[in-house]
Each structure stands twice: as C-alpha cells, then as structure tokens.
C-alpha cells in the first residue's frame, strides 16, 4: 500500500472531497474539507492518500490525522465505496498505523449502543477497527449529539495523554467547547 501526502493542489483533491462527503454524514463533518486543506500547514496534521501497490496512481482512499507529542488522533479514514469489502481498507489501515511506528494511535467511531438508522454500518465500522488491532478503551465522546467509542492501538489507553492532546487542540480553536469530552457509560463494550 502506498501512502502519499496530499496538498491542496494535488490532482486527487476533487476525488478526496467527493469521498469525504459520501463517506461521512454531515454530523461527522463539523468543518469542510476546504477548511482542513487550508489548515494543513498551520497545525501538526497529515492528509494521506491511499494507493494500491498494483495501481499506484489510482486514488483509493484517504486518512486525515492530527499529531500530538507522542500520539496521533485519526479524524477521518475512508476508502472508495466500490473498493469496500475487498480487503483494501484493512491493508490501508494497517499501512497507516505502521507509518506512525510505536505512536499511540486513537480513533473514535459511532457507538453501536445507541439507537440509530445506521446501526448495521456502526457495527461494521466497530468490527473493522477491532479486527485491525484496535482496543476499545471503555471511554466515549459525543459530537453533535452522536456518541462515539474511543479506541486505541495499544492495550493500555493513555487517558492523560488523550486529555492533554484534546486540551492542546482546544487552545487553537475559536470554539474550544466544540471538542468532545471523555466520559464513561454503564454498558460493557463487548468484543
């Protein structure tokens, strides 16, 4: 799997924007891709395009993550709809995690424990992360009324590091209250 750093002028940006809007509901897109592209040089982040080894010029997906001192928060990861269930997502995801080495990697995904119209999709996403080596931390966040499970790449969740990371992110935002806060629930996260 080939990962390419994407910039606002990259030829695949229009395909990325289309995938961004298709893959994530509006409630999970508090900022536009244009806003993300404008901040690429201003915050410690990575926007990576995913390309198969066999067809290195074929845009297949993307990852957007924000780097902390010793961590990475995966904000968005998606593969093209026509490539889903082909194994490319798992290969790409493992390549992305490998790209960051021994860094603690965090992702959050919609909780399947809430009533929702996309319950089946939520369960598929959850299983994807668990199948690819992530661990549920027992912690949750809420963004725009939707509950998310926080998962990490290591068995032990660095909660203090996560909170420090979120506080640093909030310091640079015009509306720091928009960032999700950690909380626990009384439900067991069954694997």
What would you call each of these model-derived segments?
Residues 21-54:
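Active-site rim helix/loop that mediates acceptor-substrate recognition in acyltransferases
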Residues 1-33, 149, 160-168, 175, ...:
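Short amphipathic alpha-helix that is part of the acyltransferase structural core
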Residues 45-50, 62, 148-150:
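Short hydrophobic/aromatic beta-strand element in the GNAT-like acyltransferase core
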Residues 79, 85-99:
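Conserved acetyl-CoA-binding loop-helix of GNAT-fold acetyltransferases
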Residues 117-119, 124-148:
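Conserved catalytic-core motifs of GNAT/GCN5-like acyltransferases
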Residues 22, 36-37, 62-66, 80:
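Short N-terminal edge-element motif at the start of the domain
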Residues 49, 56-67, 71-78:
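Conserved beta-strand in the GNAT
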Residues 100-121:
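Conserved GNAT acetyl-CoA-binding A-motif
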């Amino acid at each position: 799997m080939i990962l390419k750093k994407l910039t606002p002028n990259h030829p695949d940006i229009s395909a990325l924007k289309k995938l961004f809007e298709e893959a994530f509901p509006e409630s999970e897109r508090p900022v536009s891709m244009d806003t993300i592209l404008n901040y690429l040089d201003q915050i410690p982040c990575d926007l990576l395009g995913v390309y198969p080894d066999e067809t290195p010029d074929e845009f297949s997906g993307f990852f957007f993550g924000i780097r902390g001192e010793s961590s990475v928060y995966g904000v968005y990861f998606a593969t093209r709809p026509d490539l889903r269930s082909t194994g490319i997502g798992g290969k790409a995801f493992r390549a992305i995690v490998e790209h960051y080495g021994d860094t603690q990697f965090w992702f959050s995904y919609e909780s399947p424990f809430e009533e929702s119209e996309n319950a089946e999709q939520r369960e598929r996403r959850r299983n994807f992360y668990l199948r690819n080596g992530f661990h549920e931390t027992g912690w949750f966040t809420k963004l725009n009324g939707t509950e998310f499970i926080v998962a990490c790449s290591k068995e032990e969740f660095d909660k203090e590091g996560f909170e420090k990371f979120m506080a640093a992110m909030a310091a640079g935002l015009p509306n720091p209250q928009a960032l999700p806060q950690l909380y626990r629930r009384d439900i067991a996260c069954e694997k």
